[in-house]
């Protein structure tokens, strides 16, 4: 241990107390023992340190900070160097605000387009996610503070996120959902990592020994602190035993007593507590020293400029018929769409930043070189039909050379705590597009959304530009692209399917009950569409430019590929060169191809550059569940180099030496996984891949019953709580603004009452509530009252002892 000198000064109760938070965003400290308290804070695309009363959902005001583009946006830049710059700026702002741990980045795999929090995550591909997240972590930690990558792991939905069980086969777990985290841990060495809310194969992530000990700490060598998601601890003692360091936010005295009792009963040992405390002290002492050294200032203007550059480099040009873009200087434009006036530039929830400033499309238009003939909102933001607004917009469109039509998803469509209902734009926006296009065929659609959309309306626009959620400076960056000041170089980090019905997890997202079956296995995103031969609207890695690029002279072996890329157009631009690995006629089933390297290349008009793409130890491996290790199938592989997953320009065959492991699927009937057509995998085949029966999906009346499931109980009071929460949710939907507090409560298990109330409610009181919900009303009420009195007395005694020590 590194900190024996401090640990030996503390008694067991003090040590146990340090392993849970003091307030919503601070740890406990003991000045006499030389242990300072530190502050943790959201978020993944900017610092969200709350100024007054703290809450984990971003409901109360926070200190102004730079709002950078979200991870889903910056992933489209395919530029780790840019990600590192953003991370460095966020780390600087965090340290200036005395934040020691910045809770991000998020790198959950985008299993489904409907996950309401996809705007916070990088990609459907673990390699791209891992490389981008590692860059953010390096940048943040260059300032001496800690990043905290999240949510570890298999956390791909918001519905019942604190109580759902992600049922996934081991190979898919390792190859798809953990590889991004593996890259981050091994390449960027984060000082902290956040465990996810959910269970993984029946065991909560925060107490999952296979996840935290076997893989994270032993196999990957992680020696930092594992922090729970806020309220995400189920069994605090098991978490400590199996590798979880710090329970947040502030569970109060009950958490301390739980650990004390666990040590005394032999459930865990004092050595377990000491190991976790040693990890925590390393985090606390290192980051506290960095915060103390900081000047408490940063260059807000420079960070705004960086935010604008990041947004611009992440813009994806999806369609550009007749080379409508870029627009020449002086072009008369009609600006239409509510988002031009009130931009959607970030997501809702714990990542929401109180931006220092926010550029709007209308504000930046005067400096763009374009001539505005006027602005019309065109549609109601929450989707209500408005014929007058549409008529005004159509009349304005007829007066212009081109229309800049700003469309997108509103605040209720994508948010923490809420999954999307569909992949569609609102009907009133589509109707407006059709009407505007009739008035002016030179219609440019600008989309602001944190995830992919269905585009049946694509024929009604001449150009389509995806700005995602561009942060506080995204509007100016978009105009830089539209007027040609910046040549778009972004490419999609997720596939845009033609329809939700085409997506691989359509029948199992987000699960009808507590169990969420990851039945599609390895076939997520482009891995599915290309293997199963499903057409898409826009493939993974797609993005157009105002210039053209030629690929030539590919030379490759099992370690690297070298080629020449030439800008054959008349203006400078950036090309993202992508390398996919394929094994035709493989014995071990696998996706048709997988991204294994990429590089972003800046080229002047007419310039050629040699590009070398290096293949690492993950290029040819697969997880063999029979040998429980990484293996390589030997033989001939194809290295496919191209401008997108569907636009392969050059290929090379390479011979790879295998490990000669036995086929883990020998003798097993897995036809859907062999073909990749996994939308309709039958139960028997899924159980064969899983290696066990499909778990029971019934709601149980226990500590992990969510408030949104109380209608399954036997208590009138429980039914009343459920009815009130449901009514409040429906009211917020009608207003068009998510009520994050109600959403959190709706998906919150009963045990979280003891984890989120700073000790006001104990787990004993929760057990009394469970008894009431089970129908034992009188006995349950008596227990709640008894445990409440007991909790007040014990908390007062504990706090008195801790203060005096």
Which ranges hold each PLM region?
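Long, compositionally biased, glycine/small-hydrophobic-enriched stretches that function as flexible linkers
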Residues: 693-805
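Intrinsically disordered regions, especially transient/low-confidence alpha-helical propensity segments
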Residues: 75, 227, 493, 627, ...
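Glycoside hydrolase catalytic-domain context in secreted enzymes
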Residues: 1-622, 636-641, 645, 758-760, ...
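Terminal connector regions
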Residues: 617-664
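Charged, amphipathic alpha-helical linkers/stalks
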Residues: 652-724
